[in-house]
Each structure stands twice: as structure tokens, then as C-alpha cells.
């Protein structure tokens, strides 16, 4: 039986942060930079406060760039593991359709039955989780792989990977 890997979508497969920051900067001042975001709560770095989340809409999620190497390595992982994409989507209902369409376009080799759209990842049971969110890995019981991002740079409790090539070396 294959081991199960749960892979986060935003900031692991899809480059949410750069597009979100660019979108926020069209409405907000001062000019926000990705490297300046040192914690999960992006609203601490903007003048829009809670309204920063209004930018998490269909168009943003549908048009994200693919993280380099993620398609090729995910396809290789599927030969050895049962791969699921697990993404928090129910907190932003406009993202549900967009995320599924995005995955269908850029990761057509992942069946829809292996896509989990949820609100809280603490229900996920797998052998390995790859995520950029510290809070998602804290409650996970398997191997915890932290995908590097500006907001998690001070974290050292998990296996850190800088890119998909490192995931390939560790898991294949």
C-alpha cells in the first residue's frame, strides 16, 4: 500500500503570495513586499486591516502562477505515493470553483477525487504533509514538511524545504 502525501495548494503548488501582494498594492499604501511578511497574518502589514481578505476572490485564485518544479515533482510523487491536494477553501467561498479549475488546468493528472477542499486541515490523516502554514503542521501527526515562505522563516520545528527539487531529493 502506498503512503499518502497531503500537499497544500496555496504557496506550495500555486504562488499566492506574490499575486496577492501585487493585488493589495493596487489598493493599499505603503508598498508591501513579500519579503516583509514575517507572520501568517498579512493584515498586520497593510492599511486595509480586515479588508485585505476581500482580495481573495475568484480572479485571484484562478490566475495564480505555478510554483516552479511543482508539476513535474508531483507527477513523479504519484508513482510512489497516493497524492492528495489539501487546500483551505471554505473560508473564502469565491475560491472554491477557482481552485478546482486551476488544479484541473495545471495539474490535470491529479483526479478530482484526490482534491480536498476544507476549512481546517486538522482533520487530515496522511503519512506526509507538505505545507507553508505552521498552524497546519502543528496538529498533523505524520511527517511534517514546511515549504519555505517569508511568513514561516523563523520556524525550526519541522523539516524545511526551499523548493520542489528539495522535496524530490527527500521523498523520491
UniProtKB/Swiss-Prot annotation:
One of its GO terms (biological process) is pyrimidine deoxyribonucleotide catabolic process. Gene3D superfamilies: Deoxyribonucleotidase, domain 2 (1.10.40.40), HAD superfamily/HAD-like (3.40.50.1000). The active site is at 8 (nucleophile), 10 (proton donor). Keywords: Hydrolase, Magnesium, Metal-binding. PANTHER family: 5'(3')-DEOXYRIBONUCLEOTIDASE (PTHR16504:SF4). Belongs to the 5'(3')-deoxyribonucleotidase family. The lineage of its organism: Bacteria, Bacillati, Bacillota, Bacilli, Bacillales. Pfam families: NT5C. This is 5'(3')-deoxyribonucleotidase. Its cofactor is Mg(2+). InterPro entries: 5'(3')-deoxyribonucleotidase (IPR010708), HAD-like_sf (IPR036412), HAD_sf (IPR023214). Its EC number is 3.1.3.-. Dephosphorylates nucleoside monophosphates such as the 5' and 2'(3')-phosphates of deoxyribonucleotides in vitro. Also catalyzes the dephosphorylation of coenzyme A (CoA), pyridoxal-5'-phosphate (PLP), riboflavine-5-phosphate (FMN) and nicotinamide adenine dinucleotide phosphate (NADP) in vitro. It is an enzyme of class 3 (hydrolase). One of its GO terms (molecular function) is 5'-nucleotidase activity. Mg(2+) binds at residues 8, 10, 132.
Amino acid at each position: 500500500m502506498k503512503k499518502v502525501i497531503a500537499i497544500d495548494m496555496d504557496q506550495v503548488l500555486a504562488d499566492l503570495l506574490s499575486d496577492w501582494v501585487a493585488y493589495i498594492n493596487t489598493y493599499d499604501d505603503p508598498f508591501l513586499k513579500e519579503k516583509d511578511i514575517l507572520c501568517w497574518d498579512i493584515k498586520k502589514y497593510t492599511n486595509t486591516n480586515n479588508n485585505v481578505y476581500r482580495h481573495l476572490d475568484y480572479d485571484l485564485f484562478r490566475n495564480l502562477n505555478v510554483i516552479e518544479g511543482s508539476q513535474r515533482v508531483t507527477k513523479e510523487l504519484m508513482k510512489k505515493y497516493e497524492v492528495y491536494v489539501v487546500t483551505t477553501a471554505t473560508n473564502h467561498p469565491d475560491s472554491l470553483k477557482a481552485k478546482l479549475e486551476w488544479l484541473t488546468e495545471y495539474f490535470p493528472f491529479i483526479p478530482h477525487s484526490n482534491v480536498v477542499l476544507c476549512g481546517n486541515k486538522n482533520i487530515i490523516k496522511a503519512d506526509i504533509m507538505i505545507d507553508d502554514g505552521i498552524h497546519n503542521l502543528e496538529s498533523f501527526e505524520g511527517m511534517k514538511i514546511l515549504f519555505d515562505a517569508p511568513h514561516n522563516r523563523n520556524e525550526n520545528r519541522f523539516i524545511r524545504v526551499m523548493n520542489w527539487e528539495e522535496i524530490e531529493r527527500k521523498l523520491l
